[in-house]
C-alpha cells in the first residue's frame, strides 16, 4: 500500500519532500522508533510524559521511509535533523494513527461483528461471557482484554487492556485471517482518551459502571466519564448501546444515547433486561430473567450481585447480535469463570476458604467483601494494598471499606512501582478508624502467609488487588509474584504443621 492512499482523509500536512514521495510503498507501521525496519511508516504518538514523535530521526535512521509527527515533536527535533526525510505533520495523531492503521490492515473492524465493553469494573467478566455465548453459537470469536488476546488456535498475554491503534488493527486483521466472525474487546478510558480504537465501529457497546479509579490520569470523575461516554456516540457506535441502569453514570449515558439505539439492564429495578425471584448461594445464583422476548428461568455459577449485572449485560449484548436467550442461558452453567476473578484456591476441609480477586478500586473491593460475606461461616480476613504511581485518593477509601466489611484486615504492598511502599500503606491506614483490627505488613508474601496460617477452619481469606497478575512491580523492576502461588504455599505449610 502506498503512502498517498494511507493519508487519504487524514488530518495531515506533508512538509517535505514534494508529493512524488507519497507514492512510496509502505510495508509496515511502527510507533516505536527502535522497532522500525526498512519500508516502515513511523507514527510518532504523543504520550503523557514524552512525545514519541521526537524520535523521528532515529526512525528514519532505522529504515522508516516516512514519519508522521506532531508540531510539538517537530519543535523538539526540527527538520534540520534530517533534511531529506519524508516528514508529515498531524495535530491529531490519535485520529491519524487510527485511520492509517485501519486502512493499512484493510479495515478489519468492518468485517467483524465488533462488541466493546467499557466501565470501571466488570469488563473482563462481561467480555468473557459474550465470547462464551458467541462460541456456543458457532460464531468464531476473538477476545481482546486485560488478560490476553485470543481466538481459537491463538493466545498471547495482553500488554494493555486495549492495544494501541496499530497493534489493535493488526490483531483484528489477524483474527479475520484466522476466520473469526466477531471480536469482543475491553475498551479502557485511556484507550478512548488516546484514540486507540479510532478506525473501529462497534455493533454493540456495553457500559458496566463508573466508580472512582484512574483519577491520576483523568483528574476528575467528570473527565473520566467523558472519556467512557465517547464509546456511545459516532464514530465509534454504529449499532446498539447496552447500559447498566443501576449505575448513576449509566442513567446519564442513557439520556445521551439516541432514542431507539439503547438497551438497558438492571439487577435491582426495571429495565429491558432485569431479574426477579433471585436466590443467591455459595455456588452462584438462580432466578428469572425478564427480556424483550419474555421471562426465562436461569442458573449461574457466578457469585455476587455484581456478577449478575455482568451476566445481564452480556446477555443483552448477545441478544442484540441475534443470539436466542435460550441458547445463552443453556450454556451459562458451563461458564468456568475468569482467572483472578473470585478465584478460589482450593485447600483441605480444615483450611480457610481462600479467594483471589482483582478488586483494586473502592467499589470493586466493597462488592467483593459483600459477595463473600454470606458464604463465610467464621471471620472474613482481607489482605490488600494499593498500586504506586496511581490514584492516591482511593487509598483511604479502600482502607475504610476493608475495615468496615472485614473482621480482620492486613494491609500490604500491591505494585508500589517508584513510590515508597511505606507512604502507600500510610495513605491506606489514614482511612481506617483507630480501633479497627488492622495489621500492616509491607511484604505481600508474608502478609498472605500470616493471613492463611492465622485463619481458623470456616474463616475466609480474601486476597484482593492483583487477581490474575503473575508479577509485582518494585521500582521499575517487574518480578515474578502470583497471589495464587503464595496462597498454595501457605496452605501447604498449614497442612504440614
Curated annotation (Swiss-Prot):
A motif (Meso-diaminopimelate recognition motif) lies at residues 414-417. GO terms for biological process: cell division; cell wall organization; peptidoglycan biosynthetic process; regulation of cell shape. Its main location: cytoplasm. GO terms for molecular function: ATP binding; magnesium ion binding; UDP-N-acetylmuramoylalanyl-D-glutamate-2,6-diaminopimelate ligase activity. InterPro entries: Mur-like_cat_sf (IPR036565), Mur_ligase_C (IPR004101), Mur_ligase_C_dom_sf (IPR036615), Mur_ligase_cen (IPR013221), Mur_ligase_N (IPR000713), MurE/MurF_N (IPR035911), UDP-N-AcMur-Glu-dNH2Pim_ligase (IPR005761). The lineage of its organism: Bacteria, Bacillati, Cyanobacteriota, Cyanophyceae, Synechococcales. This is UDP-N-acetylmuramoyl-L-alanyl-D-glutamate--2,6-diaminopimelate ligase. ATP binds at residues 119-125. The modification N6-carboxylysine is found at residue 228. Keywords: ATP-binding, Cell cycle, Cell division, Cell shape, Cell wall biogenesis/degradation, Cytoplasm, Ligase, Magnesium, Nucleotide-binding, Peptidoglycan synthesis. One of its GO terms (cellular component) is cytoplasm. Meso-2,6-diaminopimelate binds at residues 390, 414-417, 465, 469. Belongs to the MurCDEF family. MurE subfamily. UDP-N-acetyl-alpha-D-muramoyl-L-alanyl-D-glutamate binds at residues 33, 161-162, 188, 194, 196. Its EC number is 6.3.2.13. Catalyzes the addition of meso-diaminopimelic acid to the nucleotide precursor UDP-N-acetylmuramoyl-L-alanyl-D-glutamate (UMAG) in the biosynthesis of bacterial cell-wall peptidoglycan. It catalyses: UDP-N-acetyl-alpha-D-muramoyl-L-alanyl-D-glutamate + meso-2,6-diaminopimelate + ATP = UDP-N-acetyl-alpha-D-muramoyl-L-alanyl-gamma-D-glutamyl-meso-2,6-diaminopimelate + ADP + phosphate + H(+). Pathway: Cell wall biogenesis; peptidoglycan biosynthesis. Its cofactor is Mg(2+). It is found in: Cytoplasm. Pfam families: Mur_ligase, Mur_ligase_C, Mur_ligase_M. Carboxylation is probably crucial for Mg(2+) binding and, consequently, for the gamma-phosphate positioning of ATP. Signal peptide: none annotated.
Amino acid at each position: 500500500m502506498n503512502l498517498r492512499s494511507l493519508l487519504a482523509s487524514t488530518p495531515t500536512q506533508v512538509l517535505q519532500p514534494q508529493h512524488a514521495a507519497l507514492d512510496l510503498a509502505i510495508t509496515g507501521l511502527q510507533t516505536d522508533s527502535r522497532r522500525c525496519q526498512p519500508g516502515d511508516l513511523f507514527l510518532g504518538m504523543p504520550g503523557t510524559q514524552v512525545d514519541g514523535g521526537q524520535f523521528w530521526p532515529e526512525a528514519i535512521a532505522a529504515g522508516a521511509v516516512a514519519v508522521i509527527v506532531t508540531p510539538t515533536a517537530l519543535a523538539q527535533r526540527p527538520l534540520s535533523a534530517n533534511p531529506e526525510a519524508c516528514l508529515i505533520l498531524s495535530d491529531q495523531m490519535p485520529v491519524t494513527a487510527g485511520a492509517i492503521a485501519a486502512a493499512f490492515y484493510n479495515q478489519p473492524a468492518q468485517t467483524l461483528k465488533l462488541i466493546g465493553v467499557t466501565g470501571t469494573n466488570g469488563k473482563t467478566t462481561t467480555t468473557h461471557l459474550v465470547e462464551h455465548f458467541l462460541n456456543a453459537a458457532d460464531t468464531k470469536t476473538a477476545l481482546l482484554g486485560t488478560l490476553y488476546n485470543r481466538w481459537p488456535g491463538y493466545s498471547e498475554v495482553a500488554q494493555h487492556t486495549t492495544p494501541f491503534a496499530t497493534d489493535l488493527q493488526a490483531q483484528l486483521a489477524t483474527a479475520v485471517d484466522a476466520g473469526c466472525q466477531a471480536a469482543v474487546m475491553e475498551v479502557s478510558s485511556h484507550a478512548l482518551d488516546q484514540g486507540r480504537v479510532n478506525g473501529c465501529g462497534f455493533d454493540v457497546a456495553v457500559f458496566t459502571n463508573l466508580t472512582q479509579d484512574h483519577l491520576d490520569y483523568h483528574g476528575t470523575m467528570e473527565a473520566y466519564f467523558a472519556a467512557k461516554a465517547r464509546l456511545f456516540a459516532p464514530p465509534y457506535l454504529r449499532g446498539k448501546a447496552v447500559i447498566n441502569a443501576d449505575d448513576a453514570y449509566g442513567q446519564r449515558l442513557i439520556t445521551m444515547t439516541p432514542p431507539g439505539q439503547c438497551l438497558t439492564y438492571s439487577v435491582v429495578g426495571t429495565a429491558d433486561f432485569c431479574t426477579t425471584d433471585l436466590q443467591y448461594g455459595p455456588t452462584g445464583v438462580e432466578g428469572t430473567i425478564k427480556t424483550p422476548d419474555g421471562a426465562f428461568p436461569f442458573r449461574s455459577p457466578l457469585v455476587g450481585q455484581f456478577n449478575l449485572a455482568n451476566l445481564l449485560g452480556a446477555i443483552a449484548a448477545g441478544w442484540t447480535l441475534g443470539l436466542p436467550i435460550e441458547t445463552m442461558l443453556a450454556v451459562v452453567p458451563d461458564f468456568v469463570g475468569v482467572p483472578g476473578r473470585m478465584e478460589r484456591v482450593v485447600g483441605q476441609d480444615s483450611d480457610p476458604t481462600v479467594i483471589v480477586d482483582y478488586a483494586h478500586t473502592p467499589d470493586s473491593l466493597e462488592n467483593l467483601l459483600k459477595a463473600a460475606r454470606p458464604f463465610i461461616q467464621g471471620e472474613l480476613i482481607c489482605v490488600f494494598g494499593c498500586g504506586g504511581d496511581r490514584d492516591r485518593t482511593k487509598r483511604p477509601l479502600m482502607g475504610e471499606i476493608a475495615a468496615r466489611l472485614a473482621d480482620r484486615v492486613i494491609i500490604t504492598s500491591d505494585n508500589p512501582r517508584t513510590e515508597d511502599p511505606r507512604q502507600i500503606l500510610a495513605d491506606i491506614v489514614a482511612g481506617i478508624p483507630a480501633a479497627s483490627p488492622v495489621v500492616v505488613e509491607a511484604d505481600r508474601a508474608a502478609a498472605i502467609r500470616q493471613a492463611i496460617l492465622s485463619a481458623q477452619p470456616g474463616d475466609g481469606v480474601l486476597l484482593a488487588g492483583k487477581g490474575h497478575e503473575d508479577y509485582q512491580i518494585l521500582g521499575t523492576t517487574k518480578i515474578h509474584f502470583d497471589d495464587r502461588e503464595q496462597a498454595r504455599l501457605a496452605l501447604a505449610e498449614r497442612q504440614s504443621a
